[in-house]
Amino acid sequence: MKEKRGRLTFPINGEALHVPDSTYLACPRGHEPVLRLDDARRLREHAIDLYRSKYRLLSSEEIRSIRQRFGLTQGELARLLRLGQNTLSRWEAGRNVQTAAMDVLLRLLRDVPGGLEYLRKHAA
């Protein structure tokens, strides 16, 4: 197997995203790329970043910043948004992408005064 770099396709939410400059192994007999675990992880994270950029979703850093701005733990924000803590953790780590609806809710929390208090009152 020989290491190569090139454009690979990765599906995010049913959409095939073309990720440039990806590292993979090429088998001389086969046509399918072979990915090492670290390369596959980087490919997925890069595809998620491309998806977020394409649809103008908050980045993982922006999501973390919103949570930290209010002094919340991942568990506290997850409860307010009615999510599992692991889901929020994956968004912040760039391993999964939030839905458009959750993106809007996070933006409202960030941009609308009193949003946190409203969620605290009505999330239970």
Predicted segments — roles?
Residues 1-57, 111-124:
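N-terminal flexible/basic segments that precede or flank functional cores
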Residues 35-101:
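Extended interfacial segments that mediate partner engagement and assembly in macromolecular machines
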